[in-house]
Design a protein with these regions (language model features):
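Short, solvent-exposed mixed-charge patches
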Residues: 168-171
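Extended hydrophobic/Leu-rich segments
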Residues: 18-20, 100
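Mature extracellular/secreted ectodomains of secretory-pathway proteins
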Residues: 52-166
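Bacterial N-terminal signal peptides
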Residues: 7-17
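Positively charged n-region of N-terminal signal peptides that target proteins for export
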Residues: 1-4
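Immediate post-signal-peptide N-terminus of mature secreted/exported proteins
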Residues: 21-61
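Sequence-pattern detector for short linear motifs
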Residues: 6-7, 36
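Residues at structural and domain junctions
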Residues: 8, 25-26, 45, 86, ...
C-alpha cells in the first residue's frame, strides 16, 4: 500500500513538472542515455531489486523532462496494462511502467526507427522480460494478459499482433 501511494505521488509530481521541465532543458545527453539504458536493462532483469524504485523514479522524471524522446500507448494491449492491478496488484505498477521504460530503451538504441508498432512491441517485450524475472522470484505472480502475450512472443508473433492492434498513425 505504501509503495503504491509513493508511486502515485511520484507520478503526480512528475506530471505537474512536465510543462516547466520541458521548456527548461535541452535534449538528453549521451551520459543520461547510457544511464537510462543501464537502468532499463537492470529493471528488465531484476525488477524487484532494492534499488528498483530509485531507478524507476529517475527514469520517469527523466522521460518527462527530455524533449527528444517520447513514448506512446497506441496498442490495445498496452492500454490494457492499466487494468493489471485488478487482477493482482502486487507487481502491477512495476509491469505497467516497464512498458514505457522498454520503449524508451528501444528508441535510444534504434533512433531511426519510426514504426510505432515496432516500438510498442519492444515495450511489451521488455515488460515480458520483467514479468518472467518476477515469476522466477514469485511463481504465484500471474497475469493472464501477459501470459497470452508471452505465448505470442514464443511463437514469434508478438510484433505482428501489436501491428494489427496499433492505433497510432505511423507504423
Amino acid at each position: 500500500m505504501v509503495r503504491k501511494l509513493i508511486a502515485v505521488v511520484i507520478v503526480l509530481l512528475v506530471a505537474a513538472s512536465l510543462p516547466a521541465a520541458a521548456k527548461m532543458r535541452g535534449p538528453s545527453t549521451p551520459e543520461e542515455r547510457a544511464q537510462a539504458l543501464q537502468y532499463v536493462q537492470s529493471l528488465e532483469d531484476h525488477p524487484l531489486a532494492k534499488d528498483s524504485l530509485e531507478k524507476r523514479m529517475w527514469l520517469t522524471e527523466w522521460l518527462v523532462q527530455i524533449p527528444d524522446v517520447t513514448v506512446n500507448v497506441c496498442c490495445k494491449e498496452l492500454k490494457a496494462l492499466e487494468a493489471l492491478d485488478k487482477v493482482n496488484d502486487t507487481y502491477s505498477n512495476q509491469l505497467r511502467m516497464q512498458v514505457y521504460y522498454s520503449q524508451l530503451a528501444f528508441q535510444l538504441q534504434h533512433p531511426d526507427e519510426k514504426s510505432t508498432a515496432t516500438i510498442q512491441a519492444a515495450g511489451l517485450a521488455g515488460t515480458l522480460r520483467a514479468y518472467r524475472a518476477i515469476q522466477q522470484f514469485d511463481p504465484s505472480a500471474k497475469y493472464p494478459l501477459l501470459d497470452n502475450l508471452m505465448s505470442l512472443e514464443r511463437q514469434g508473433k508478438l510484433q505482428k499482433y501489436v501491428q494489427k492492434r496499433n492505433k497510432c498513425v505511423k507504423g
